[in-house]
C-alpha cells in the first residue's frame, strides 16, 4: 500500500438531497480513478456504495459509505452521505472529518430544503463547498434559472467553473431565434 504525505490526502463528503445523484457521482469517481471497470447504477442495484440489502430495496442510501481512490497523485477519502432526511445525522458527522463538501444538486428540482440545511451546516463548520449539478440534461432542467436560484439562496459567491454544453447550445439557439424574429 502506498504511503501518502498528509498534504496528499483529501477528505471529501458528497452531500445533497435524497436522489440528487451522490452515489452516481461516487460511481463515476471510482470508474475515472480506475478502481472499478464498470459503473454501477441505482436501478441495477449494483453500486459500490449502496451494498446493504435495505439500500438496494429502497433504491437510495441509508448509510454513509466511505471509499478511497487516487487521482492525480492525491489520495481521496470520500464519504458518500445519505440524503434522506431521516438519516441526515450521517452527513453532519461526515462533515466533521472532511476537508470539503461537494453538494450535489438535481438540476430538475433545483435547491431543495435538505440542500439548504446541509449548506447551512457547512457554513457553521466553516467547510469549503463545491456544487456539482446533476441531471442538467433533464427535460425540466434550466441551467440559467438554477444558477440564479443558487445565487439567491447561497449568495453571490456562487460561480460557475464549467458550463454544460447544452446551456451554450440553448443560448445560441435562443439568439438565433431572436435574430430571426427581429428580422421579420
What would you call each of these model-derived segments?
Residues 1-105, 111, 160:
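P-loop NTPase switch module centered on the Walker A-proximal segment
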Residues 1-20, 38-39, 106-176, 183-184:
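P-loop NTPase catalytic nucleotide-binding module
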Residues 25, 178-181:
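Cysteine-centered loop/knuckle micro-motif
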Amino acid at each position: 500500500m502506498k504511503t501518502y504525505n498528509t498534504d496528499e490526502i483529501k477528505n471529501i463528503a458528497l452531500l445533497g438531497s435524497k436522489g440528487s445523484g451522490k452515489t452516481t457521482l461516487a460511481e463515476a469517481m471510482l470508474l475515472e480513478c480506475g478502481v472499478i471497470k464498470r459503473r454501477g447504477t441505482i436501478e441495477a442495484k449494483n453500486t459500490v456504495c449502496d451494498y446493504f440489502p435495505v439500500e438496494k430495496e429502497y433504491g437510495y442510501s441509508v448509510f454513509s459509505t466511505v471509499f478511497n481512490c487516487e487521482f492525480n497523485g492525491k489520495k481521496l477519502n470520500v464519504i458518500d452521505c445519505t440524503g434522506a432526511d431521516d438519516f441526515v445525522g450521517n452527513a453532519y458527522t461526515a462533515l466533521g472529518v472532511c476537508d470539503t463538501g461537494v453538494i450535489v444538486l438535481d438540476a430538475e428540482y433545483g435547491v431543495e430544503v435538505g440542500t439548504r440545511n446541509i449548506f447551512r451546516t457547512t457554513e457553521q463548520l466553516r467547510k469549503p463547498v463545491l456544487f456539482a449539478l446533476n441531471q442538467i440534461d433533464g427535460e425540466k432542467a434550466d441551467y440559467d434559472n438554477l444558477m440564479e436560484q443558487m445565487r439567491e439562496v447561497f449568495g453571490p459567491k456562487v460561480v460557475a467553473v464549467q458550463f454544460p454544453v447544452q446551456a451554450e447550445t440553448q443560448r445560441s439557439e435562443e439568439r438565433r431565434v431572436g435574430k430571426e424574429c427581429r428580422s421579420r
